[in-house]
């Protein structure tokens, strides 16, 4: 069974992604990366990316992550903070600890594409 299925499918990933961005927007250390961004659209794009990355349907049509983040100046510390917000959203949704860590491990695979400083 895929991580996508274990998490509860599309609706669960969408809900976790919405909470993930709520957590980010409440954190001044990373919220500024999303100033002026259409957050409902961003949430949908990220949920589609996560669905595909977690073994679900591949409806993600976003741009290359390395290109998107090239000029953002994201540090390792900021990426770690964002991963913490993902972990918190998953935990808050009642996801089992082992599944949280497996999901975080998938998210960690893009660190090299997102971190630029």
Swiss-Prot record:
Q: Gene3D superfamilies this protein is in?
A: Globins
Matching entries from InterPro entries are given as: Globin-like_sf, Globin/Proto, Globin_bac-like_CS, Hemoglobin_trunc, Hemoglobin_trunc_I
Give cofactor(s), names only: heme
- According to its UniProt entry, this protein's organism is Paramecium caudatum
By what name is this protein known? Group 1 truncated hemoglobin trHbN
Family under the similarity heading: Belongs to the truncated hemoglobin family. Group I subfamily.
Question: What are the N-acetylserine sites (modified residues) in this protein?
Answer: 2
Name one matching Pfam family: Bac_globin
């Amino acid at each position: 069974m895929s991580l996508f299925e274990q998490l509860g499918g599309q609706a669960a990933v969408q809900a976790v992604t919405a909470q993930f961005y709520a957590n980010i927007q409440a954190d001044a250390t990373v919220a500024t990366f999303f100033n002026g961004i259409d957050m409902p659209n961003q949430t949908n794009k990220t949920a589609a990316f996560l669905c595909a990355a977690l073994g679900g349907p591949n409806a993600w049509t976003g741009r290359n992550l390395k290109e998107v983040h090239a000029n953002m100046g994201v540090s390792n510390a900021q990426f770690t903070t964002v991963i913490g917000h993902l972990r918190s959203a998953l935990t808050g949704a009642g996801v089992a600890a082992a599944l949280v860590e497996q999901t975080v491990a998938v998210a960690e695979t893009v660190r090299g594409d997102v971190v630029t400083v």
